[in-house]
From Swiss-Prot:
Coiled coil: none annotated. InterPro entries: Phosphatase_reg/MetRdx (IPR051330), TIP41-like (IPR007303). Pfam families: TIP41. GO terms for cellular component: cytosol. GO terms for biological process: TOR signaling. Belongs to the TIP41 family. One of its GO terms (molecular function) is protein phosphatase activator activity. The lineage of its organism: Eukaryota, Metazoa, Ecdysozoa, Nematoda, Chromadorea. This is TIP41-like protein. It comes from the Eukaryota.
């Protein structure tokens, strides 16, 4: 057996051992959280062979981005199942498919000298050697919906209910991707679920910070009740220039769980995601 094959087999075994799976049922809903190690930088099979199970090949084939984030957790996912056929899944591949692959980011800071000096080397590299792409990896991803109807709604999530200290029956948190923006900030996509008696709350949060320039948060919040055949999904984009955040403690802006509260809402959408009653059984 070649050394190469021995190494590959060790890596495969390590990947299997590193995988974590959590499941929880609440009424009509099932929650499945999967976690594993980051996407490999090279394939584990020989170049003259195709392996349908190779995740790196899948990402290379399906993503148009010139570069991927430094850390992509391709084996991580969070899924809400509605009965037999409906689901909302959060995964890195579908999220990255919504990153702009053909132009540089519009960070809405005009001719900011701070931004220009901090990123000039990266801009020049992209312009000269690569296709331009959104190196902040901003994604408006709301989840991958299967077997459900999505309709606009005037219903809103009861945020006061979520502030209650109800007993948590199940919780899970996964990272989908992360990049340090060439040491000039961070871009991060996280998914979390919290299940209480009678209801649940899911949060998908994209947090992006270009140091001393811009802060952006895209939140998808989903709330459902135990025996409802639908959930309410709220999506919000919040952002602000650092120059408008001088009144905020800088430590707050570095906290992915607190920064959003200091940012104004730029855009928001509200949906009802539902399945037919007969599909619940």
């Amino acid at each position: 057996m070649s050394d190469r094959r021995s190494i590959d087999e060790v890596m495969v075994r390590a990947a299997k051992n590193a995988k974590r799976e959590e499941k929880f049922d609440l009424g009509f809903f099932k929650f499945i959280s999967l976690a594993g190690h980051i996407l490999e930088s090279s394939c584990k099979h020989s170049e003259d062979q195709e392996d349908p199970s190779c995740l790196k090949c899948k990402y290379d084939r399906e993503l148009k981005l010139e570069e991927r984030p430094e850390m992509v957790f391709a084996r991580n996912s969070l899924t809400i199942q509605f009965g037999r056929l409906g689901s909302i899944e959060f995964n890195a591949l579908d999220a990255l498919k919504m990153v702009c692959a053909d132009r540089l980011p519009d960070v809405k800071v005009g001719a900011s000298t701070v931004w220009q000096s901090a990123r000039q080397d990266r801009i020049q590299q992209i312009s000269e050697h690569q296709k331009p792409f959104d190196w902040t990896y901003t994604t408006h991803y709301k989840g991958t919906v299967t077997g459900c109807q999505v309709t606009p709604t005037t219903e809103r999530i009861d945020m006061e209910r979520l502030k209650r200290r109800d007993e948590i029956l199940f919780s899970s948190s996964i990272t989908l991707f992360e990049d340090e923006l060439a040491d000039h900030g961070i871009a991060q996509l996280l998914a979390r679920v919290r299940v209480m008696r009678g209801y649940f709350f899911v949060l998908l949060r994209f947090y992006m910070r270009v140091d001393n320039v811009l802060l952006r948060v895209c939140d998808t919040r989903i709330v459902g009740n135990e025996f409802d055949g639908h959930v309410i999904r709220e999506w919000q984009l919040r952002e602000a220039k650092y120059g408008n955040l001088g009144h905020v403690d800088p430590e707050e802006l570095l906290d992915v769980d607190r920064a959003w509260m200091h940012l104004p809402v730029v855009e928001e959408h509200f949906d009802r995601v539902s399945v037919d009653r007969e599909r619940l059984f």
